């Protein structure tokens, strides 16, 4: 079964399990939006692998007049996002592969959360370059994602600590989350920073890290 099918199956329960599976939930998503450096109150935003729209919801708290395009390959996840943003005419949805989809417009901000780690290293490099080119001057790229520690012992220890901090969740939901992790292809912080440099970003930083979770921020 593909990763898309796995997320489609879990769409209705996805949000309710996030805080249990991500002990740093509020800081992780909150810092990803707080670090964005864009002064206008109506940015044009693209959310890659948007899922049910959690990160976009955080963004709307900072930029309530933002025009946001949510893109995801999992149709059922986007249906949940449509419910979340019902009545907001500034929100639109695209069900497609963000590696191959062609845009005829540029954006002020490109965001993503817990999606890009499903790509191979080469795909990550391609994606970052692709969307760097779609950013306006002064545009921001933010990726809140899972990362890989190059030391296997450290990586295993970090995962163990995360398991210790997992909140209340059913055994079935926990086992399903473990199965979804088998599709993960996280890359190191250093590799992804190098990808951002090669894509031409002038400013790059890691404003947040918690065990395997990290926020990448870059600005043209």
Segments predicted by a language model, with ranges:
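Residues lining the SAM
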Residues: 112-116, 144
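Core SAM-dependent methyltransferase catalytic element
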Residues: 199-220
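Class I SAM-dependent methyltransferase SAM/SAH-binding core
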Residues: 46-48, 52-100
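A short glycine-rich, Lys/Arg-flanked "PGG" loop and its adjoining helix->strand segment in the class I
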Residues: 125-137
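A short acidic, Gly/Pro-enriched loop at the edge of an enzyme's catalytic core
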Residues: 102-110
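Conserved class I S-adenosyl-L-methionine
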Residues: 1-39
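C-terminal alpha-helical "lid/dimerization" subdomain adjacent to the S-adenosyl-L-methionine
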Residues: 144-199
